[in-house]
Design a protein with these regions (language model features):
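C-terminal substrate-binding/catalytic lobe of Rossmann-fold NAD(P)-dependent oxidoreductases
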Residues: 3, 7-44, 122-247
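Glycine-rich phosphate-binding loop at the start of an alpha helix
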Residues: 56, 60, 82, 114, ...
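Rossmann-fold NAD(P)-binding glycine/threonine-rich loop
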Residues: 64, 77-100, 116-118
Length: 247
């Protein structure tokens, strides 16, 4: 029985995670914390793994507490840049038995979409990303879109692809999206959406679209459970769920 704590327990992802952990026969929910609750409860409750679905502004402090107290972490909060990842590695180096999984997306289809897009990008002249989310999402572009763009940029470098052609002059700032690596990302925020992403690849005479749609947050839960069950056996930092899957 793995003892699990959840941070951001009252949020949309946190609420679903709490319900899923409670229903799992091999997991025990020992702490469900949200804004205003004491993080010390994690240690007092004996949590072995903590799942963080909080906010980019608070996730680093949560990680520091958990890692320094020997608690493995599964993080779905986005907003991790190279500086934050370096800080996490530094914390883990001082606590080498602790595992930390940071995942831009917990949807199996989303992970596969990122991998497929990176493979396809080696063979197409151009690629852009459109990510679509509900208007309460805290960040833009999404962590999934950022990670996808990084994987595509790396894949294109390995394949020695030339720069993407673009002779457009933008009449308004941001009209061509935000660049991550070589890839333009366009962020849409609309009521009624959950989490969606389309990668559009183009070359002479054809285009290829790779799209993933999260219709309901229950779709994330099987891979959240996978992370909880596997993180302890993967000490150090694991960035991206593809490292826990047979891809």
């Amino acid at each position: 029985m793995i003892k699990v704590g959840v941070l951001g327990a009252n949020g949309k992802m946190g609420t679903q995670t709490v319900a899923t952990i409670t229903a799992a026969a091999d997991l025990e929910l020992v702490a469900a914390l949200d804004l205003g609750d004491s993080i010390e409860t994690l240690k007092k409750s004996g949590a072995e793994v903590v799942v963080d679905f909080t906010h980019p502004d608070s996730v680093m402090a949560n990680l520091e507490y958990a890692i320094n107290n020997g608690i493995n972490v599964v993080v779905g909060t986005t907003g991790f840049d190279s500086a934050k990842l370096a800080k996490v590695k530094e914390l883990l180096a001082k606590n080498p038995k602790v595992g930390a999984l940071i995942a831009p997306n917990f949807g199996l289809g989303a992970v596969l979409m990122m991998q497929f897009a990176a493979q396809a990008a080696k063979h197409f002249e151009s690629v852009e990303i459109i990510e679509l989310h509900h208007p309460n999402k805290a960040d833009a572009p999404s962590g999934t879109a950022t990670r996808t763009a990084e994987l595509i940029t790396d894949a294109r470098k390995v394949a020695n692809r030339p720069p993407m052609p673009d002779a457009t002059t933008s009449a308004l700032p941001g009209a061509r999206g935000a660049k991550v690596g070589d890839v333009a990302i366009h962020s849409v925020r609309l009521r009624g959406l959950v989490a969606h992403q389309e990668v559009i690849l183009g070359d002479q005479g054809e285009t290829l679209s790779i799209r993933h749609d999260s219709i309901d947050r229950t779709g994330f839960m099987p891979v959240v459970l996978l992370g909880i069950r596997k993180v302890e056996s993967h000490p150090g930092l694991t960035f991206g769920l593809e490292n826990f899957l047979d891809l």
